[in-house]
């Protein structure tokens, strides 16, 4: 697929870094770009990690400012004074209404301008945190909407959609990137790189998946 280009929605976290490395191996480094969004997230370290990884992997990164979201919605992911909690409906208060819809929209606008048709997102509904915009049905509906809105044949890829966190770690290992992702990526809601705080929902999910994968690997 070296004659095609891909745009990866990139946060510097485990999932999007896994997708970025896979895209490099699939499309070729020279055919891959990353797009990152500054939307008022709790910790600047997320943007710093994304910038560092993109540079380290030799990938062109574009950062877009979507901080206006703070004017119209409030949640714990954009307020570092708020405690992270899960509502009765099972959705954590770190869920940002409309975030992935906006990410896909702006990624598509950018991609079309660059002549890119393949958009890659690291969303997953198997081990997801209860976020409705991580579901496959949402991504497929956005793909149709964007194609109609821009009269352009986008193909949104979600390679992690049906993988558990353990399987995502296995994929990283298959690509020779397990240690890189383990040590360099940022997933923690409390702003701790690598191993994280081990207490927030994101860290718990990440560490549980890693432990499960390493245990299964040991048993082989």
Swiss-Prot record:
<comment type="similarity">
    <text>Belongs to the QueC family.</text>
</comment>
<keyword id="KW-0479">Metal-binding</keyword>
<comment type="function">
    <text>Catalyzes the ATP-dependent conversion of 7-carboxy-7-deazaguanine (CDG) to 7-cyano-7-deazaguanine (preQ(0)).</text>
</comment>
<dbReference type="GO" id="GO:0008616">
    <property type="term" value="P:queuosine biosynthetic process"/>
</dbReference>
<feature type="binding site">
    <location>
        <position position="188"/>
    </location>
    <ligand>
        <name>Zn(2+)</name>
    </ligand>
</feature>
<dbReference type="GO" id="GO:0005524">
    <property type="term" value="F:ATP binding"/>
</dbReference>
<dbReference type="GO" id="GO:0016879">
    <property type="term" value="F:ligase activity, forming carbon-nitrogen bonds"/>
</dbReference>
<keyword id="KW-0862">Zinc</keyword>
<keyword id="KW-0436">Ligase</keyword>
<keyword id="KW-0671">Queuosine biosynthesis</keyword>
<dbReference type="GO" id="GO:0008270">
    <property type="term" value="F:zinc ion binding"/>
</dbReference>
<feature type="binding site">
    <location>
        <position position="200"/>
    </location>
    <ligand>
        <name>Zn(2+)</name>
    </ligand>
</feature>
<protein>
    <recommendedName>
        <fullName>7-cyano-7-deazaguanine synthase</fullName>
        <ecNumber>6.3.4.20</ecNumber>
    </recommendedName>
</protein>
<dbReference type="InterPro" id="IPR018317">
    <property type="entry name" value="QueC"/>
</dbReference>
<feature type="binding site">
    <location>
        <position position="203"/>
    </location>
    <ligand>
        <name>Zn(2+)</name>
    </ligand>
</feature>
<keyword id="KW-0547">Nucleotide-binding</keyword>
<feature type="binding site">
    <location>
        <position position="197"/>
    </location>
    <ligand>
        <name>Zn(2+)</name>
    </ligand>
</feature>
<keyword id="KW-0067">ATP-binding</keyword>
<feature type="binding site">
    <location>
        <begin position="10"/>
        <end position="20"/>
    </location>
    <ligand>
        <name>ATP</name>
    </ligand>
</feature>
<dbReference type="InterPro" id="IPR014729">
    <property type="entry name" value="Rossmann-like_a/b/a_fold"/>
</dbReference>
<comment type="pathway">
    <text>Purine metabolism; 7-cyano-7-deazaguanine biosynthesis.</text>
</comment>
<dbReference type="Pfam" id="PF06508">
    <property type="entry name" value="QueC"/>
</dbReference>
